[in-house]
Amino acid sequence: MAEVVHGPVADPGAVLALVAEAQAADGIGPLSEQFRLGVAGPGPHVVAEGGYAGIVIPPAGGPGAVEAVVAPSHRGRGLGRELVATALDVAGAGATVWAHGDLTPARAVAARLGLTPVRTLLNLRRPLADLDPAPSAPDGVTVRTYAGPADDTALLAVNNAAFAWHPEQGGWGPEQIAERTGADWFDPAGLFLAIGSGSGSDEADGRLLGFHWTKVADPATGLGEVYVVAVAPEGQGRGLGRLLTSVGLHYLADRKLDTVELYVEGDNAAALHTYTKLGFSEHERHVAYAHS
C-alpha cells in the first residue's frame, strides 16, 4: 500500500537503486534530475514496496509536479496508478505527472486516471563530430568562463529573466546555483558567459548578456549536455544563443565526448528551429499529464 512521507525517506539509496533497475529495463530514466536530487530531500514522497513517487511543490505556490517509478517485478498490479493518484492528491489542484519516454504503461495509467497531455519536452541529440566552426562574437560582446560565486547574482538574474515562464528553470535562487556548482559533474571551464564590453546604453561593460552551462552527462558513454542556454532580454536578437551553444559544443567535443543532448519544449518553435539548424534531432519524448 502506498504511504505518504512528509520528510526524508528511510533509505534514499534503495529508491535510487529502484530507479536504476527501472532504467535498465525500460531504456530510459523514470525520474528527472530534479526528482533524483529530491529523493534525499524533505519530500513529500509516496513510497510503497517496489514503487516510489516524488512530489515537487513550487516554493512560490502554483501547481505541483509528480514523477513515479515501479520496479519491473511489481508491474501489472495497479501500483503505478496507486502511486500517481496518491501523489497527485498531495500535489494539489493542477498538478502534473511526467511520463519519461511516454511509454505505453505510463499512457495506460494516465488514461485510467482520466489524465490528458498538457506539455511535451523533447530530448534532442547530435554527434559531436564534424562541428561547424563557432561564429565570431558580435561587436561589443566577449565570451569567458565562470569565475566563481562573484558571477552567481548575474547568472540568476539572466536565468530568471530568460525563463520567467518556465515551471522548473524559472524562479531559481542561490540554493539552485549552489546545488549545481557543488555537483560532481560541475566544471567551471564548461560554463560560458557572454559579457557586454561596449559602451552602448544596453550593454554596459561587464553586463552578463547570456550564458551556456554545459554538462558531461555520462562520461562512460561519451554523452555531453547543453544543460542551460539563457539570453537576457537585452541580448536577444543578436545571435548570442547560437554563439554560446556553438562554443559549448566545441568545448564538449574537445573533452572527447561523442554525442551531445539537450531538452527543449515541444512547442518552442524558435528554439527547435535553432537546434535543428545546429544538427540536432529528436531522441526521446517526455510528456506531462494532468486532469483536464
Swiss-Prot record:
Monomer. InterPro entries: Acyl_CoA_acyltransferase (IPR016181), GNAT_dom (IPR000182), MshD_Acetyltransferase (IPR050276), Mycothiol_AcTrfase (IPR017813). It catalyses: 1D-myo-inositol 2-(L-cysteinylamino)-2-deoxy-alpha-D-glucopyranoside + acetyl-CoA = mycothiol + CoA + H(+). Belongs to the acetyltransferase family. MshD subfamily. This is Mycothiol acetyltransferase. Acetyl-CoA 2 binds at residues 229-231, 236-242, 268-273. Its EC number is 2.3.1.189. The keyword Repressor does not apply. The lineage of its organism: Bacteria, Bacillati, Actinomycetota, Actinomycetes, Mycobacteriales. It comes from Tsukamurella paurometabola (strain ATCC 8368 / DSM 20162 / CCUG 35730 / CIP 100753 / JCM 10117 / KCTC 9821 / NBRC 16120 / NCIMB 702349 / NCTC 13040). One of its GO terms (molecular function) is mycothiol synthase activity. Keywords: Acyltransferase, Repeat, Transferase. Residues 2-138, 141-292 form the N-acetyltransferase domain. One of its GO terms (biological process) is mycothiol biosynthetic process. Catalyzes the transfer of acetyl from acetyl-CoA to desacetylmycothiol (Cys-GlcN-Ins) to form mycothiol. The keyword Repeat applies. SUPFAM superfamilies: Acyl-CoA N-acyltransferases (Nat). Pfam families: Acetyltransf_1. Disulfide bonds: none annotated. Acetyl-CoA 1 binds at residues 68-70. 1D-myo-inositol 2-(L-cysteinylamino)-2-deoxy-alpha-D-glucopyranoside binds at residues 33, 168, 215, 225, 263.
